[in-house]
Regions:
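Asp-box/BNR beta-propeller loop motif
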Residues: 26-45, 72-89, 124-144, 194-206, ...
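Short coil-to-beta transitions that initiate beta-strands within beta-rich domains
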Residues: 33-61, 85-102, 111-113, 118-121, ...
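Conserved beta-propeller blade signature
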Residues: 64-66, 106-107, 183-185, 194, ...
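Short, compositionally biased serine/threonine- and acidic-rich segments at solvent-exposed termini, linkers
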Residues: 396-434
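Glycine-centered coil/turn sites that cap beta-strands in beta-rich domains
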Residues: 432-469
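Short, glycine-anchored, charge-dense loop/turn motifs used at functional sites
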Residues: 468-478, 509
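Glycine-centered tight-turn motifs at strand-turn-strand junctions
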Residues: 477-504, 516-520
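C-terminal tail/sorting-segment detector
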Residues: 508-528
């Protein structure tokens, strides 16, 4: 399996901002101190489960599931979680941008967000590579040039090239390892598409057609510039965003200027692009590529976005389906911003901004799920309008990464288990960041417009009915609702409304959970 997840955009999206650990705050990132030297030689159990509730990257293979942004993994269907001990990722500003798992080889592309001139710039931070199934990881530097790398030999031509010498705008948005020959491919936006034949120790540029050509071949002389940027000499088609080596060994490279195919290992290329017809790309920005292998030859599914460079049908969000090596192209889910794909035989799962889409007829018709309910508790749901960023199917289990947790289904999407970062009420070792509490609320502060509801966590000794009261700063009751709880830890939700259905004003609110003889109290800060 290769990368599973959203590829955050240079222009629009910053999924993995740095977050500190504070009890009851908006993000949960908890763990022991890091190792040194950038290498990992130990596995650390995560007592709090997954370490972030926004799951943008996901890979499941042979019963193991790996999730971002901190390389959590589980071998028992999410019952317990671990992470590698590495100071290149955990406890730093770095986050997982891409991951590919092929048997015992795990390649993780990491990046961060730098602030330059008041703007957040996504930045390459290198790679973590394991060849022993994740027991240890080695660090590799980002895929950059030296100042002297201002030309590129391509067949009979020596082309002018722009040296990419800084890591800003070159994060590893996608990565794919080819177990057949050991080649490693990365899509790094401003650094383009690159290949390594020595497990990331060195990298070479991959030359794609410029914006004014749809075919290139090494025996033909050219004079275009290899320049992954906008501008008179630059090419959108040199700005790499996704890459896939399919089971036949064909190389597919998605860029901001189209989808490129090589049948000779990445030398000669043919470019597909949107032309306004239904037999072309929906949009020229290819942010994700996945292979459906139950067809012969395989079918390639592309998340094709509007680049903003052209309008009309050629610039729509949607899914482009390429069959028979690209000789047959059709479109689906027009208007949907799609991030990822997974397959179970003929069933197709698509992760999108508006939910999870499921097709059993090769994308001609779709069912969709926009809100997920936990089968263990009727009151446990994902937030309305949560985005679905990533999806994977492995050994009968459907894994879905959302902006509000990791989801697992054992029955192909009919019922769900919701997994969140699980900060305990009574930790085995209490600390300032994870204190011993009878109750807490999250996210806190709470914004109804952004969060939809706040979750109140508490523990009941028995199954019974109770009430939760919300008070304003003057201790006036603004909301009361009944709860039916199970023995153990429970979560209830408040939508930020008063008893008249009117959103409450900004300020501090207090809550009281009444469960028979037990009462738990906490505070919620509402900021809209």
């Amino acid at each position: 399996m290769r990368i599973k997840g959203i590829k955050s955009t240079i222009f629009l999206l910053c999924m993995f901002a740095t977050a500190s650990v504070t009890f009851g705050q908006r993000a949960f990132l908890v763990g022991p101190p890091q190792s040194s030297l950038g290498n990992s030689n130990a596995l650390i159990e995560s007592p709090y489960g997954i370490l972030n509730n926004s799951i943008a990257n996901l890979d499941a293979n042979n019963g193991l599931v790996w999730v971002g942004p901190y390389l959590n993994f589980s071998s028992n269907q999410g019952a317990s979680w671990y992470r590698p001990e590495t100071d290149s990722l955990f406890g730093t500003v770095n986050r997982l941008f891409s991951i590919d798992v092929e048997d015992d080889v795990i390649v993780a592309g990491i990046g961060r967000n730098d602030v330059v001139g008041g703007q957040s710039i996504q930045t390459a931070a290198g790679f973590l590579i394991s060849e022993d199934g994740g027991l240890s990881f080695q660090y590799r530097f980002p895929q950059l040039d030296g100042p002297e790398d201002d030309t590129q030999v391509y067949g009979v031509s020596t082309l002018p090239a722009l040296p990419v010498i800084v890591p800003q705008q070159s994060p590893p948005f996608d990565i794919d390892y080819n177990p057949t020959n050991g080649d490693l491919w990365v899509a790094g936006w401003a650094s383009g598409i690159r290949k390594s034949s020595d497990m990331g120790r060195t990298w070479s540029r991959v030359v794609l057609p410029p914006d004014n050509l749809d075919l290139i071949s090494p025996e033909i002389p050219y004079s275009f510039s290899v320049e992954p940027q906008r501008g008179s000499n630059g090419s959108l088609n040199h700005m790499g965003f996704s890459v896939l080596v399919d089971k036949q060994g064909l190389i597919w490279a998605g860029t901001a200027g189209g989808l490129n195919l090589s049948i000779d290992g990445g030398v000669a290329w043919r470019r597909f692009k949107g032309d306004g017809t239904s037999q072309s790309l929906t949009g020229n920005w290819i942010i994700s590529l996945e292979e459906q292998t139950n067809t012969s030859p395989s079918t390639i599914w592309a998340a094709s976005w509007n680049t903003g460079e052209s309008g009309g049908a050629a610039g729509q969000y949607g899914v482009t389906i390429l069959e028979n090596g690209g000789s047959s192209i059709r479109q689906s889910l027009l208007g949907e911003k799609v991030f990822d794909f997974a397959f179970n035989g003929t069933t197709v799962y698509v992760a999108g901004d508006n939910g999870l889409f499921i097709s059993k007829d090769a994308g001609r018709t779709w069912d969709s799920i926009s809100q997920f309910k936990d089968s263990r508790s009727s009151g446990r749901v994902t937030r309305p309008h949560s985005s679905v960023f990533s999806v994977e199917y492995d050994q009968g289990i459907l894994w879905v990464g959302t902006s509000d947790g990791l989801l697992r289904s054992d029955d192909e999407g009919r019922t769900w288990t919701i997994l969140h970062a699980n900060i305990p009420l009574h930790p085995a070792q209490a600390s300032n960041s994870v204190p011993n509490k009878n109750t807490y609320a999250y996210p806190n502060p709470f914004s109804r417009g952004e969060d939809s509801f706040v979750r109140i966590k508490y523990e009941a000794s028995d199954a019974l009915s109770g009430t939760i009261n919300i008070f304003d700063f003057g201790m006036n009751v603004v909301r009361e609702f009944r709860v039916d709880v199970q023995a153990g830890v429970n979560e209830s939700m408040w939508d930020g409304m008063d008893m008249s259905g009117i959103p409450v004003s900004n300020g501090a609110y207090f809550y009281e959970v009444n469960l028979g003889k037990s009462r738990f109290r906490g505070k919620i800060l509402v900021i809209e």
